[in-house]
Structure formats: C-alpha cells, structure tokens
Amino acid sequence: MHPETEQACLVPSSKKTKLCSENFEDKFSSLLESVVSIILSQLPTAEAVSTSVLSKSWKNIWTNITDLHFDDTKQRDPSDSRFTDFVERVVGDIGSPHISSFYLCSVNTFDETLLFSWLSKVLKRNLQRLVVTCNDLEIISFSSLFPSFVSLVELRLRTKSILDISAPAILPNLKFLSLEDARIFNMSSVSKNLVLNFPVLETFEASYCRCFRTDTVIIDSPLLRIFEMFKCTSEHVPNPSQVCKIRVLASKLEKITFCGDEPRKIHLSFPPSLPDAYLALSRSEWPKTFLRSFTCVTSLALVLSKDFHVMAVPKFSQLVYLHLIYDMTQHFRLMQFLKSAPILEMLSIRDLTSPRSTPTAKSLKELRSVESPDCVTTMLKVLQIRNFKPNRLQISVLRYVLDNAEILGSVILSSPNPITEEEKARILAFPKASPHASVLFE
C-alpha cells in the first residue's frame, strides 16, 4: 500500500472521535475520486459498497470501482436471496465504463438467467478477467456470450456449462483459459474439426470436459507454454475409430499435464520440441500410439495405476529425467521404461504399493535376475527414491540399481519418517558398481 494511502486508512475506531480531529487528519478528502475508486476496487465488493454510509460524499463513489468480487461460500442457504439481490443491485448501479474483472463464487443454487444477465452487462464494458465458480447450478449455455469474450485476458469457468461453436473460435486477447465440466459442441455443418484460435494464450486447462461431434480439435496457440487436461473425454465422434484427435499447435510449449482413464477416446498430438510431460494413466490398455506422442520429451513424470497396461513402450530417445510413480511389486513396469530410455541420466521413483501387499520371494528374485538395461549400466547418474521405506521391496530396487549402475554418482533416499542409524549403516554397506556413488538420506 502507498504510504499516503496507508496513513489515510488510520482512522480511529471510536465513535466519539471526529474524523478530522487535531490528532487525525482526513487524508481521503484530499485524494482524487479516481484514486479512491482504485483503492475501493482492491476490496471485496461488499466492503466497497459499505463505504457508502460514511458520508453523503461517499454515497456513490463505490459505483466507479472496476473490479467486482462476489463470494457467498460462507453462507450456504439456497432460500436466502440476499446474495443474488446484492449482485443484481451492484451490476445494475455500477457506473464504470470499463470493468477489469468479474469474480463470482457461489455454493448456492439460483436462477441461471440471473448469471446470464450479469455477464451480459459486464462483458459490454471491455471486461478482461472473468471467473465463475458455481458448482450447484444446472447446465448453463454460454454459447451466445462467446462472441463477447473477445476482450477477455483470463477466463475461468468452473460450472456445468455448454459451449456451442459453429466456426473457428478466435479469442485474440486471451492468455489464460480454464474450463471445468464444460460440454463443447461442434455445431458446424461444414467441418468435423473444431478450431480454437488463441494467438496469445499462455495457459490452457481443461478438467472433466466433454467434446461432442468432433473429429479433431485444433488448438492454435503459438505462445502456449502450459497445457493441462484432467479426465476429459469425447462422445459421438464422427469417425469409425470413435477417437477424437487433439492437435496442439504451439512451438513454445513447455509442459504437458495429462490425467486420463479412457485410453481409446482421445489421441494427443504435440510439437516435437515439447520438453516436459506429466502423465497420470489408469485403467485398461493404453495404445502405443498414445505414448508415442510424448517420445520427444527430455523430462517425463508418469503415475501408473496398478491396472494400467500397455503392450509396448515406444522409444524415448531424448529422455534424460524420468519420475515414475508405480506399484513396485510390478518390477516389469520399471524395466519397460528403462529399456526404452537409452540416454536416461536421472531416475526418480515412488512406490504406490498398497500397505497390505507383500512382495513374494519369487518376485524379488526375478528382479535380481533381470538383465540390466544399457541406460542403467552406462548412463544413470542419479537415483532418487521418494517416500522411501527400508522394506524388502524398496531395498531390492535400491540394490538392483547399486549393483548395476557403473557411473552412478548420487543416491537420494527421501523418507517421511526418520531412518534408524542401524538401517542407514546397513544401506551404506551395500556393494556398489560405481566407486563414486554416495548415499544421501533426506
């Protein structure tokens, strides 16, 4: 806060003390109304409106605020209309020709037409940031409002929504897009493809979204850096395979985060310059073609459920860092990816094994007898085991790497609980193929 503004806020709380007394000078009176409006815009809208009771001169100053923030999460009562009445009054009385942001978070149900009315009004004022979080509302169609999104820099819709798009969607100013539980329909009678043209978009997030009647979704965003997709799917795909293809045209893309459990619904395609990916995969059999989309990465994080299955792992010829979260009783899973990463230098693993699972002596023996992949023998320099527990299973994996990694430099064992000195001494005494390998306990 600016020093002058901070001093102006130091008004005594006693009702008996006058605003302009010998000890306290009214600094606000000397501020321009535009400055006061900026200050009020930083407050929650309810607090900004409450300043209207200070004096006659303050009665309408709040109507010039440019940031609207409404939140009823502390009062769950669908029968109480005071919140919607308040929003209706503020949106109707606001006098600012330009509104920077509109934030609405509600845990109650109300008439969806009210939300549509509020958005229609604020979008006409060159709105830049729009955030709507209303999980209890029925499905809302934003389709007719979509052309009004052209001024938006940030759009976050966390509500059951419908977006009907019949032509290439162009949002020229959008930098951040986050959709949750959206139904996206391709309404074009000419093309089976859906083109999203966001020339300055930097971050794309989609979770629990569904795409209908679309063969290919093309996201044309040359400045896109972060792409996240969480449990999205497709329906009524107009091709025999019933697979919706998603092509991301983004030469500056830095990281992909993907979580899914329907391997045959979506196929992803990215530029070959993609450096980093995080994939959480579960259920059923994932086609080799899905993983092939990520073979260009140098850094890969994989979360694999116990029921994850893939017939063959493609070659990750540029992979240097692998973080694998998996059920360590399935040692073949680790071997699948080690054999497919010829230049791997850093391996980080974390166990997803159920506490009730106990590895058999046979499975531990199988791990020791597996031929070491080339990357372990000649390339691996760092091993990290996260959430390390000195049980038979994790010790067997640790010893496998120590026995075979000839140029290993560091072993990092990150444990949530203290490891006894006796256990540390036992681990430090394990034979090592690399004379330079050191073990660090975290």
From Swiss-Prot:
InterPro entries: F-box-like_dom_sf, F-box_dom, FBD, FBL13/AtMIF1-like, LRR_dom_sf. Residues 26-73 form the F-box domain. Keywords: Leucine-rich repeat, Repeat. LRR repeats lie at residues 126-147, 151-172, 173-194. Residues 370-414 form the FBD domain. PANTHER family: F-BOX/RNI SUPERFAMILY PROTEIN-RELATED, SUPERFAMILY PROTEIN, PUTATIVE-RELATED. This is F-box/FBD/LRR-repeat protein At3g14710. It comes from Arabidopsis thaliana.
